[in-house]
């Protein structure tokens, strides 16, 4: 099913749309559909890091070859195309924060920071400078008008392609100016459209790696920027026993079982990371069960103010990992009055640095309500993991 483009503009010829073109099939199809519909389309591709290394790698988005692919698609569509050098912004806003988070014992999601900053905040400003009405991307998430006139974000039609988890930090103001034409489409249909449009990227593989991590080896990036994250320390059981030594906190995440380098009669899992003491704490699987989550940097897209929703103990759904299904939860206020999330069915392996993303219960978990960065996880009143975001 082709997307409805009327919410972008009813007079295409007089409506300028900037398309964020990564060089992949999804954003290329967005540009192609809009150009075919008669919109005034401008393609923009971001150069985010050293292209000399990236151009030799496969499976990473925004790599050197991707810039050439985006330009090739734009040429075939007959639309203007610009490459913007955002390397310094990307390093400061995404790569440095990524390294800081691992050094602090967190498990960060750099794609969230990238979407929140350079891809939306900065690129929306560029789109405005270019006189565009909206910015369109190839993300798999839906955008629809709400009854009160605001725009809501919704999970994509194809569940295993849904990217709403990574877009939770999109603000209400940004949502007004963003459009996601592929939210109601299946990937197979997108590729078929790419072939129909004659795009050279119709069969191009999807990106897999974190774009700035060569060969998927994030530890090399972290240790180069934050050497302290690679310093060895103790692996400590919850009962206080020192079981061995670890290779640096950056190599571990909550819920990890393999690669601990210790031999014990029973399976043990990473249940907490204390970067200040250089300790990796392990325990049995039941120690991973979490019932309450504390958050920072919360972005709220609900219909009432966040603290009002917490005071009313609003039922929601949440995702604490991108690959997990939404699970029932409740918004509350902790003893200090700060928003907190109660997991009604519990969750395992809740890692500080990951996102807890909110979905509307009334819509069957279809509508995105925002989310925040996990900084605290508690099990039955027992504190398991806490940290301050660097």
Swiss-Prot record:
Region span, Interaction with tRNA: 161-163
Site (Interaction with tRNA): 139, 354
This enzyme's EC code(s): 2.8.1.13
Top-rank EC class of the record's enzyme: transferase
Highest taxon in the source lineage: Bacteria
Gene3D superfamilies referenced in this protein's UniProt entry, alphabetically: Adenine nucleotide alpha hydrolases-like domains, HUPs, Translation factors
Compartment list: Cytoplasm
Active site per the UniProt annotation: 114, 211
Keywords carried by this UniProt record: ATP-binding, Cytoplasm, Disulfide bond, Nucleotide-binding, RNA-binding, Transferase, tRNA processing, tRNA-binding
Protein family: Belongs to the MnmA/TRMU family.
PANTHER family named among the record's database cross-references: MITOCHONDRIAL TRNA-SPECIFIC 2-THIOURIDYLASE 1, TRNA 5-METHYLAMINOMETHYL-2-THIOURIDYLATE -METHYLTRANSFERASE
Entry protein name: tRNA-specific 2-thiouridylase MnmA
Native organism: Azorhizobium caulinodans (strain ATCC 43989 / DSM 5975 / JCM 20966 / LMG 6465 / NBRC 14845 / NCIMB 13405 / ORS 571)
């Amino acid at each position: 099913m082709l997307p409805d483009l009327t919410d972008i503009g009813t007079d295409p010829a007089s409506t300028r749309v900037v398309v964020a073109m990564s060089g992949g099939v999804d954003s290329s199809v967005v540009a192609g559909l809009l150009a075919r519909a008669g919109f005034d389309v401008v393609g923009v591709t971001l150069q985010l890091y050293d292209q000399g290394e990236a151009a030799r790698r496969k499976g990473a988005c925004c790599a050197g070859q991707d810039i050439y692919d985006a330009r090739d698609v734009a040429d075939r569509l007959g639309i203007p195309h610009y490459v913007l050098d955002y390397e310094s912004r990307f390093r400061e806003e995404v790569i440095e924060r990524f390294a800081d988070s691992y050094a602090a014992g967190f498990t960060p999601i750099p794609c969230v920071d990238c979407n929140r900053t350079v891809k939306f905040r900065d690129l929306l400003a560029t789109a405005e400078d270019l006189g565009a009405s909206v910015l369109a991307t190839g993300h798999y998430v839906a955008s629809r008008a709400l009854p009160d006139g605001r725009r809501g974000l919704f999970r994509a039609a194809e569940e295993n392609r849904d990217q709403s988890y990574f877009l939770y930090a999109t603000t209400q103001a940004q949502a007004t100016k963003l459009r996601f034409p592929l939210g109601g489409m299946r990937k197979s249909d997108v590729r078929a459209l790419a072939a129909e449009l004659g795009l050279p990227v119709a069969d191009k593989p999807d990106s897999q790696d974190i774009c700035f991590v060569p060969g998927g080896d994030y530890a090399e990036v972290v240790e180069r920027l934050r050497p302290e994250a690679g310093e060895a320390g103790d692996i400590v059981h919850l009962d206080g026993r020192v079981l061995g030594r670890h290779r640096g906190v950056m190599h571990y995440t909550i819920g990890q079982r393999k690669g601990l380098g210790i031999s014990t009669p029973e399976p043990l899992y990473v249940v907490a990371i204390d970067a200040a003491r250089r300790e990796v704490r392990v325990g049995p699987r039941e120690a991973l069960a979490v019932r309450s989550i504390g958050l920072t940097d919360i972005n709220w897209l609900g219909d009432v103010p966040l603290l009002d929703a917490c005071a009313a103990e609003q039922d929601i759904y949440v995702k604490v990992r991108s690959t997990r299904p939404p699970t029932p939860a409740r918004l509350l206020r902790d003893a200090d009055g700060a928003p907190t999330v109660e997991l009604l069915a519990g969750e395992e392996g809740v890692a500080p640095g990951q996102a807890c993303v909110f979905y509307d219960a009334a819509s069957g978990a279809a509508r995105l309500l925002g989310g925040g960065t996990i900084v605290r996880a508690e099990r039955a009143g027992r504190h398991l993991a806490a940290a301050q975001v660097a």
